[in-house]
Amino acid sequence: MGQKVNPIGLRIGITRGWDSIWFSQSDYKKNLHEDIKIRKFIQSRFSNAGVVKVVIERFPEKINVNLHTAKPGIVIGQKGSNIEAVKKILKTMTEKPVNLNIIEVKKPETVAQCIAESIALQIEQRQPFRRVMKQELRRAMRGGVEGIKILISGRLNGADMARRENYKEGRIPLHTLRAKIDLGFKEAKTTFGQIGVKVWTYSGDFIQSKEESEEDKYAVKRRTS
């Protein structure tokens, strides 16, 4: 099971929170489609800014969009011009005021999405894919991850038949739910077609604090009593 399912979705509520933080009984469908449109727009607008994730919080009168990025300068623009332009577009799209919060990713060399985007960009620039994969592998291990796996598939080096190659270092315990596993995906568009890049990173286990475990025990007792 752990080998097939998306490791992020499998661990929501265990090692990772939700990317959409809101509740609605009547407008659930409308809000869900709006969230998808917002994410697609931001990903296309800032495709070269290393956008890791977009967290959307909804309130009755406004929407908060928290944008986690490795390159905040590109997102902000000169004197905040990009932010103001994006806020206007999102306000038109959602018909509500939108607050755009930029959160910088501290160590992009250890984040799966940033690694996948870096590999895809270098493949588009005609860099040797094996060298690129090995470089990113070493950089991530030096950055502090405990395991990393990189998989690319497509017409590698312009070959007539598509194939896949992967490199792995450390361990990726996909069946361990408390393991902090991140997944990144990006497509490199080349003259021979698209090459898919997938990256898995493992950065240790989620250890619950003593206070949280005591609260959980109390909640279980209260429900069963």
UniProtKB/Swiss-Prot annotation:
One of its GO terms (cellular component) is cytosolic small ribosomal subunit. One of its GO terms (molecular function) is rRNA binding. Pfam families: KH_2, Ribosomal_S3_C. Keywords: Ribonucleoprotein, Ribosomal protein, RNA-binding, rRNA-binding. PROSITE patterns: KH_TYPE_2, RIBOSOMAL_S3. Residues 38-106 form the KH type-2 domain. One of its GO terms (biological process) is translation. CDD domains: KH-II_30S_S3. Binds the lower part of the 30S subunit head. Binds mRNA in the 70S ribosome, positioning it for translation. PANTHER family: 30S/40S RIBOSOMAL PROTEIN S3 (PTHR11760), SMALL RIBOSOMAL SUBUNIT PROTEIN US3C (PTHR11760:SF19). Part of the 30S ribosomal subunit. Forms a tight complex with proteins S10 and S14. Belongs to the universal ribosomal protein uS3 family. NCBIfam families: rpsC_bact. This is Small ribosomal subunit protein uS3. It comes from Leptospira borgpetersenii serovar Hardjo-bovis (strain JB197). The gene is rpsC.
